[in-house]
C-alpha cells in the first residue's frame, strides 16, 4: 500500500527496510504480513 515496509529476520535481529522495487517476483510486487521470504541485505543511499 505504501510502497515500502519492514522485514523481521528469523534470527530476531533488527528489522530491515524493504522498498517494493527490491521485490523480485514474476507477478505483483507485494508481500503479505507473516509471509516468509528470502532476502539479501544491501546498503542503499540512506
Curated annotation (Swiss-Prot):
The keyword Transcription applies. The keyword Transcription regulation applies. One of its GO terms (cellular component) is cytosol. Keywords: Activator, Cytoplasm, DNA-binding, Stress response, Transcription, Transcription regulation. Disulfide bonds: none annotated. InterPro entries: Cold_shock_CspA, CSD, CSD_CS, CSP_DNA-bd, NA-bd_OB-fold. Induction: In response to low temperature. PROSITE patterns: CSD_1, CSD_2. This is Major cold-shock protein. It comes from Aeromonas salmonicida. It comes from the Bacteria. Homodimer. It is found in: Cytoplasm. Residues 1-46 form the CSD domain. GO terms for molecular function: DNA binding.
